[in-house]
Regions:
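Membrane-interface helix-loop junction between the first two transmembrane segments
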Residues: 31-50, 71-80, 169-170
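Hydrophobic cores of alpha-helical transmembrane segments in multi-pass inner/ER membrane proteins
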Residues: 60-69, 99-104, 147-159, 228-243, ...
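TerminUS-proximal long segments
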Residues: 11-13, 120-129, 314-385
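Long, contiguous internal "core" modules enriched in hydrophobic/ aromatic residues
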Residues: 11-40, 134-311
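Short, Lys/Arg-rich, polar N-terminal cytosolic tail immediately upstream
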Residues: 1-9
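Hydrophobic alpha-helical membrane-insertion segments
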Residues: 92-111, 268-277, 337-346
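Non-cytosolic membrane-interface motifs at loop->transmembrane helix junctions
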Residues: 48-54, 83-85, 215-226, 363-377
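Transmembrane-helix bundle segments that line or gate the permeation/cavity pathway
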Residues: 55-172, 190-194
Length: 385
């Protein structure tokens, strides 16, 4: 039997993708003219925060696809093989979005105005004991080096695993011994990727790229929280592609059982995200330490409170009410709706991770700017990629 796997993107979708990228590029230009080119630091921060928010979010989401491949490979999860090309195709976006994200991060890090990362200003560090103590980790050299290493590692390891997988198309396994060697090599590279993933996404990268915007604040749950947010959005993206391809007549060996399992991941990690969301908030609220509560004050009680509580409804209430039922996880329309909702909900999550820090006047406690259409337009550009 043969599987109809070769998918040629219809011209109309190429046109839509190009249109979305043009919209994103025009939005970046417009945002630069209206905010980035101004002298006020908070106006410049508005521009760079929009780029950081979208580039980091979409990079971590597409990178979650390769984590899913590696984790299921190590767990001997053969059920995902029928749609593995889908997850591989999503992970193939990592080099492109990673390059864009890396350039944005390095420009922010070495910006002479220190618009997002105040720890890059040597004068600020010299006058701040907390930043002095963290300077061994929060410094430009380590930030740049680890960022470049991380994006290269994700890209190269993903390329290696995709290359091994595609080799089966050109040269099928001829013997049982060849099959054993392939499984062994695939398992080894998956294990290497998981180790790199643990050292980056599950620890250092959220600290460097996101939490260092509020450099005084700290949370031992933050990296896991960031991982949960990006991974559940990544599973939602996988679900969207599976549903689209099934409706187009592809993935003949992928059935509602597979979609059900993907839906279980979406449901389970929505609960896991909520556990981390609540635990982080509850422990900081209970301890009432000024260094910790300053992070949540503008988010839970200030101008960002609407987004803060809305994402709780989208990312927890909706999944637990809709995806708990077995039938919902097997219904294409319901899964499509929930996948889109989850991707948007965690886009909001990353928005409130990035914006309140640089956009809050710490002297008055007021925010400088609300969410605007430019934010959605920039996101559309990354969707087009």
């Amino acid at each position: 039997m043969s599987i109809r796997e070769k998918f040629i993107i219809p011209k109309r979708y190429n046109s839509i993708a190009i249109a979305l990228m043009v919209i994103g590029l025009l939005a970046i230009i417009g945002l630069y003219v209206t905010h980035g080119a101004k002298k006020e630091v908070h106006e410049q921060a508005r521009f760079w925060a929009a780029l950081l928010h979208n580039s980091v979010y979409f990079l971590l989401v597409v990178n979650a696809a390769m984590f899913f491949i590696s984790a299921t490979t190590l767990a001997w999860g053969g059920w995902q093989m029928s749609f593995r090309r889908v997850t591989e195709a999503i992970s193939a976006c990592v080099p492109v979005i990673g390059t864009i994200c890396g350039v944005i991060l390095l420009l922010i890090c070495f910006s002479p105005d220190h618009v997002l990362y105040h720890w890059t200003d040597s004068k600020v560090v010299a006058a701040d004991e907390i930043l002095k103590w963290k300077s061994g980790f929060l410094n430009k050299t380590f930030f740049a080096g680890w960022t470049i290493f991380t994006i290269l590692a994700w890209s190269l390891l993903g390329w290696k695993m995709r290359k091994m997988s595609r080799s089966l198309d050109d040269k099928p396994l001829e013997s049982k011994e060849a099959g054993k060697r392939y499984i062994w090599n695939n398992t080894v590279w998956a294990a290497i990727y998981i180790v790199v993933f643990a050292l980056t996404v599950m620890s250092s990268i959220p600290w460097l790229w996101l939490i260092s915007i509020d450099a005084h604040w700290y949370s031992t749950m933050y990296s896991w929280y960031t991982f949960a947010s990006s991974f559940v959005a990544g599973m939602a993206l996988i679900a969207l592609f599976i549903i689209y391809l099934k409706n187009s007549g592809y993935l003949e060996y992928t059935n509602e059982e597979h979609l059900h399992d993907v839906g279980k991941f979406m449901f389970a990690f929505s609960i896991f995200w909520t556990y981390l969301w609540f635990s982080q908030y509850m422990l900081i609220w209970y301890s009432n330490q000024p260094e910790e509560t300053t992070y949540f004050k503008p988010r839970a009680q200030g101008p960002y409170s609407g987004i803060f509580w809305l994402m709780f409804i989208i990312n927890f209430i909706a999944p637990i009410l809709i995806l708990m039922r077995r039938g919902s996880k097997r219904n294409y329309a319901t899964m499509t709706f929930m996948a889109l909702l989850i991707i948007f909900g965690h886009w909001l999550d990353f928005y409130q991770m990035v914006f309140p820090g640089p956009m809050t006047d710490h002297a008055t406690g007021e925010t400088h700017v609300p969410m605007i259409l430019y934010d959605f337009a920039v996101a559309m550009g990354f969707v087009g990629l």
